[in-house]
A protein has these predicted regions:
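Conserved structural motif at the start of ABC-family nucleotide-binding domains
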Residues: 7, 22-24
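Helix-to-loop junction immediately C-terminal to a conserved catalytic motif
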Residues: 53
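Conserved ABC transporter NBD signature motif
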Residues: 61-78
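Conserved ABC ATPase "signature" region
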Residues: 100, 115-133
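Conserved ABC ATPase signature
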Residues: 137-141, 145
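Catalytic Walker B motif of ABC-type/P-loop ATPase nucleotide-binding domains
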Residues: 162-166
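ABC ATPase nucleotide-binding domains
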Residues: 228-229, 235-261
Length: 261
């Protein structure tokens, strides 16, 4: 594995029981890249991420993160933000306590926070504009505010790689804009970012690399090379209108193909 490669996936396959999710996936993501993964619901995108994190085992193949083989535990220096609706808080926890969870792998044998841990937590909360909620119960926050808390928790671990599964789903347009531009600023500082999203236009406008995924990789590369009607049709099994104006690419809503034709 090249020292400039953050993620390398070799001949990766995954099954749930007899249900084959995908087979023979190969992928390299270089350090410092901001890559978007797009595709329809149920296409295997989240499963691919879980394999990168070591949360589930592949049927076949290997995943390397920053030169190390991923086995049965998440690699260090990875921040992960799952889909908002997948996170449940049925026990009382403040914003500070939730974000402090991101520091646990830095605490050594004794799981007690020190002044440096608290400083880092306050710093990321300030950077994300939610320091005023530090002592609030997380369930009292709006969806957008909660999403910022989970982003803060991931950043508190001081990651080299940040993986986000639809971080702007279910939040208002301003929060979507703020989160995306915050991620862009992190990427400019050298953090490698992988973003699962349904927002093709945001990917086209801001990200240097996109991976179209549906039971495997359909295409990958620069958005201007990948976002073409034939590739998107294979990805979504739908006709997608692509409008180009200079460097700007706009995707209209996809219309499912008539399978009766």
């Amino acid at each position: 594995m090249h020292e400039q490669t953050m993620i390398e996936i070799k001949n990766l396959s995954c099954k749930y029981g007899n249900n084959e999710i995908f087979k023979g996936v190969n992928l390299k993501i270089e350090k410092g890249i901001f890559a978007g993964i797009v595709g329809p619901n149920g296409s295997g995108k989240t499963t691919l991420i879980k394999l990168m994190l070591g949360v589930i085992k592949p049927t076949n193949g290997k995943v390397y993160v920053n030169g190390g083989l991923v086995k049965n535990r998440p690699p260090f220096k990875i921040g992960y933000i799952p889909q908002l609706e997948a996170i449940e808080w049925d026990f009382p926890v403040t914003v500070e306590q939730a974000v402090m969870m991101g520091r646990y792998n830095k605490m050594g044998i004794l799981p007690w926070s020190n002044k440096e841990d608290k400083r880092i937590v306050r710093d990321v909360l300030e950077r994300l504009g939610i320091i005023q909620y530090i002592n609030h119960h997380i369930k009292t926050l709006s969806g957008g505010e909660q999403q910022r808390v989970f982003l803060a928790r991931a950043l508190a671990s001081e990651p080299e790689l940040l993986i986000l599964d639809e971080p702007t789903s279910g939040v208002d347009l301003k929060t979507q804009h703020d989160i995306l531009h915050f991620l862009l600023s992190l990427n400019r500082k050298g953090i490698t970012i992988i973003l699962i999203t349904h927002d093709l236009n945001a990917v086209a406008a801001h990200l240097p690399r996109v991976i179209c995924f549906n039971k495997g990789i359909i295409a990958e590369g620069r958005p201007e090379d990948v976002f073409k009607p034939d590739i998107l049709k294979k990805t979504y099994n739908a006709d997608v209108t692509v409008v180009r104006s200079g460097s700007l690419i706009l995707m209209a809503n996809a219309k499912p193909l008539n399978t009766d034709d």
